[in-house]
């Protein structure tokens, strides 16, 4: 597993089964987003695959599964700019951060856990792609009484936005509504709920979202072209 450095590394995680000397300090999680560049430009789908592979295999390198689960939830919360939630998750699991980042963490037994930077933020050279899902929008449901409700989404900028939604709506439709309201291109948006990425074809009713729940929207806006 790679440390938090400017480029990704192909290293396996340090097995935390053998406790190392724990750092003597614990710093709060820093709010700055880590910046890094991939060895090769990767698509959003490739980034998701790398993350899934890591989270699926990390517990196999010993350590405590509940700590890995907490780190995963904290990483998603931090990426969605919900640092209060991320810090609460870390505190609840008694996880300490010697340097204020999720790159290096310790549990209460002194076991060390390292997260690769690609699990904490997307690379600056991430390729934004228009997926087939965007062009193959599922057919509209049979017309019926539309029961709308206010859907709260929290942007990675920290702003909360309310959309008018109904359970049969797809994420792709709601992305376009957010674009109309806030001017954020649908291809820049990545929607997360309960730590899971929502695809454009996912309907709200499939997410089992309830009243007053919040969907996290991470915005990956491409940098302006350089002269």
UniProtKB/Swiss-Prot annotation:
From the UniProt entry, list the residue stretches annotated as the region Disordered.
1-36
Concerning InterPro entries, the annotation shows: DC-UbP/UBTD2_N, DC-UbP/UBTD2_N_sf, Ubiquitin-like_dom, Ubiquitin-like_domsf, Ubiquitin_dom, UBTD1/2
Q: Where in the sequence does UniProt note compositional bias of the Basic and acidic residues kind? A: 24-36
Matching CDD domains: Ubl_UBTD1
Q: Which residues form a coiled coil?
A: none
Ubiquitin-like domain location is 149-224
The record ties this protein, via SMART domains, to: UBQ
Checking PROSITE patterns in the record gives: UBIQUITIN_2
Alphabetized SUPFAM superfamilies for the sequence: Ubiquitin-like
Free-text function comment from the UniProt entry: May be involved in the regulation of cellular senescence through a positive feedback loop with TP53. Is a TP53 downstream target gene that increases the stability of TP53 protein by promoting the ubiquitination and degradation of MDM2.
Oligomer status and interactors: Interacts with UBTD1.
What the entry lists under PANTHER family is as follows: UBIQUITIN DOMAIN CONTAINING 1 PROTEIN-RELATED (PTHR13609)
Please identify the protein, giving its name as recorded: Ubiquitin domain-containing protein 1
Gene encoding this polypeptide? Answer: UBTD1
């Amino acid at each position: 597993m790679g440390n938090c450095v400017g480029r990704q590394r192909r290293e396996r995680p340090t097995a935390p089964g053998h406790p190392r000397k724990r750092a003597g300090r614990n710093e709060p999680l820093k709010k700055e987003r880590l910046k890094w560049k991939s060895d090769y430009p990767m698509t959003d789908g490739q980034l998701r695959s790398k993350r899934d592979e890591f989270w699926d295999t990390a517990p196999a390198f010993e350590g405590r599964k509940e700590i890995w689960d907490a780190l995963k939830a904290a990483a998603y919360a931090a990426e969605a700019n919900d640092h209060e939630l991320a810090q609460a998750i870390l505190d609840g699991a008694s996880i300490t951060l010697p340097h204020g980042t999720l790159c290096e963490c310790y549990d209460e037994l002194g076991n060390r856990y390292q997260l690769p930077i690609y699990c904490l933020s997307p690379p600056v050279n991430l390729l934004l792609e228009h997926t087939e899902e965007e062009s193959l929008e599922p057919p509209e449901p049979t017309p019926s009484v539309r029961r709308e409700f206010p859907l709260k989404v929290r942007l990675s900028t920290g702003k909360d936005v309310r959309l008018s939604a109904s359970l049969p709506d797809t994420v792709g439709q709601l992305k376009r509504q957010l674009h109309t309201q806030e001017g954020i291109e649908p291809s820049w948006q990545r929607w997360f709920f309960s730590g899971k990425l929502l695809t454009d074809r996912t309907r709200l009713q499939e997410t089992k979202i309830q009243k007053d729940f919040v969907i996290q929207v991470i915005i990956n806006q491409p940098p302006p072209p350089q002269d």
